[in-house]
Amino acid sequence: MKEILITNDDGYESEGLKKLVKMLKKEFKAKITIVAPASEKSACSHSITLTKPLRFVKVGKRFYKLDDGTPADCVYLAFHALYKTRLPDLVISGINKGANVGEDITYSGTCAGAMEAALQGISAIALSQFYKKSEKELDYKNALKITKKIIQNIFDKDFPLEKKEFLNINFPAKSKIKGIKICKAGKRVYNFEAHSNINPRGVEYYWLAAANLDFEDEKNSDIVLLKKGYATITPIMLDLTAYERMKKVKKWLKANNE
C-alpha cells in the first residue's frame, strides 16, 4: 500500500486541505497521514524551528497539528517521528488558498513543505488554487480532478523528476480550464507595502503587506498561463547555482584583482 503525507501552510483547518484529504481517501487505496501547522503560516518560506520544542497534537486518526510549527517542520518531524519503518511514497503540500508562482515560490510555505520532502529524497508536489478577490467561495473541483490524475501518474509511472526536485502546480480560478501547461516560473514585479500605526502605549508598529500582484508579461510563464485559464506545472530544482554566470563572476574577480 502506498503512503502519502500531507501538509500545508494555511493550517490544519483549511478548506483546501479538507477537500484534498476527502478526495484522496475516496480515490486511492493509500495510507494517508496529515501533519499541518496549528495556525496559518503563509509566506514563512522554508523556515524550521530551532529555538523551542515542538509537539504533535492529535486531531484525528493519523491526523496531527504541529503546535506553532511551519510546513517544513511538519514534514521534517513527521519523517523522524511518525515513519518508523519507511518514509512515505509521496508528500503533498496544499491545496493552498492562492497561487504560488514566479519568485513567490521562495516565500511560499506551501512550496517549502514539498521542498523539505525533496531535500530528504521523497517525491513531492505543491498544490495551489488561484482565485480572484471577487470570488466569495473557492471552487476546488478542477484542482481535485487534476490532482487525482497527477497522483495516478506518479503511482503508475514513477515520479518524473530527479532527487532534490519537486513539482509546483497551480490551478486557475476559472470554472472551465483550457488545459494543463508545463512551464517556467514567471518574474514578479514586487510592490510591497508597510502600514504603520501607533499602539495604545504610544509605540509604533507595522503591518507588512503585498500590493498588486504584478508580473512581467512572459509568454510561457506560470502566471500568464494561469491567468489565461490553464493549470500550470513547473518542475523546481533546489540547486540555486546560476551556472551561466560563473564564468562572468570569475572574469569579474580576476579583473578586480589585477
From Swiss-Prot:
Q: Which cofactor does it need?
A: a divalent metal cation
Q: What is its main location?
A: cytoplasm
Example of a GO cellular component annotation carried by this entry = cytoplasm
Q: Which Pfam families match?
A: SurE (PF01975)
**Any one GO MF annotation of this record:** 5'-nucleotidase activity
Report if keyword Cytoplasm is assigned.
yes
Task: List keywords of the entry alphabetically.
Answer: Cytoplasm, Hydrolase, Metal-binding, Nucleotide-binding
Q: Does the keyword Hydrolase apply?
A: yes
Residue sites binding a divalent metal cation per the record: 9-10, 42, 96
Q: Which domain of life is it from?
A: Bacteria
The record's EC number reads 3.1.3.5
**Catalytic reaction annotation:** a ribonucleoside 5'-phosphate + H2O = a ribonucleoside + phosphate
Question: Top-level EC class, please?
Answer: hydrolase
In which compartments does the protein localize? Cytoplasm
**Cofactor: binding comment:** Binds 1 divalent metal cation per subunit.
Q: What's this protein's family per the entry?
A: Belongs to the SurE nucleotidase family.
Q: What does this protein do?
A: Nucleotidase that shows phosphatase activity on nucleoside 5'-monophosphates.
Q: Which NCBIfam families does this one have?
A: PRK00346.1-4, PRK00346.2-4, surE
> What is the name of the protein in this document?
5'-nucleotidase SurE
Q: Which organism is it from?
A: Campylobacter jejuni subsp. doylei (strain ATCC BAA-1458 / RM4099 / 269.97)
Q: Give the classification, highest ranks.
A: Bacteria, Pseudomonadati, Campylobacterota, Epsilonproteobacteria, Campylobacterales
